[in-house]
């Protein structure tokens, strides 16, 4: 199915803005190089909260093309649900936030190579990832969803047999379908923006990623529907730090407890996600306060 060229949506405009500033953000990400040191003498990634305070800046990895969670807004500034959280982390440390764009597949690497202190790029906790990074307690929960053209809507995984499913590299969707549905042909992209464009251009039959994302995208793209709204088990989104940085990990977990007392993530949802989802979702379905999912039956 071909995209309608004349269609311009808020997410499309944001994607255009992201392209315009991505190079500048990338330069900022690389300016220090791997293992860069702060004014405190400690390497980014290895720093404790006190060393971050001394440096006056915390470096946070985010998505630049994944609205409404992490993206570049029309003014060329980082925005979204994860960015509001990142801004609060920086404020409570008494420092400024420096945001670095990351691809989904590079979220662990930027921590291991000392490019960021924290990854806040809508990072789903998995056992495999937990071997490479240390996850804080969760602040969001998701499952997988599948979006497809309404004219050829995919409503059950069985319909994907022999068809082409678009996924983004390094995501839980890629891992899930590789492990559970080898009958589905996967077409992989590095960037979310490229994956969505491939769907619009008709290069694949459907696209799968977190249900929160495909629901938001479909709302703003007439002609596409989320026929599968929940696939696989409930997964959790959390901040991640370099493996072994227990000082920063403990600070983040304590911060989550304090933020939970004020329902911070409900407020973040109302600011960044509610305008997109409307009645399609509620904060109680998605947010996790205090680092503990009180609705879980597991």
Label each residue range with its predicted role.
Residues 25-29:
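C-terminal motif of bacterial Sec signal peptides marking the signal peptidase cleavage site
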Residues 31, 83-84, 88-92, 171, ...:
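Extended ligand-binding regions for polar small-molecule ligands
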Residues 32-38, 175-189, 226, 256-298:
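Ligand-binding clefts/hinges and TM-proximal coupling segments of bilobed small-molecule sensing domains
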Residues 38-122:
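Extracytoplasmic small-molecule ligand-binding "clamshell" domains
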Residues 45-46, 99-109, 152, 169-172, ...:
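Short helix-initiation/N-cap motifs at beta->coil->alpha
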Residues 87, 96-159:
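Acidic, polar ligand-binding/catalytic clefts
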Residues 109, 123-131, 200, 204-234:
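A ligand-binding cleft/hinge motif common to bilobed small-molecule-binding domains
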Residues 140-148, 215-256, 276-298:
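Periplasmic-binding protein-like
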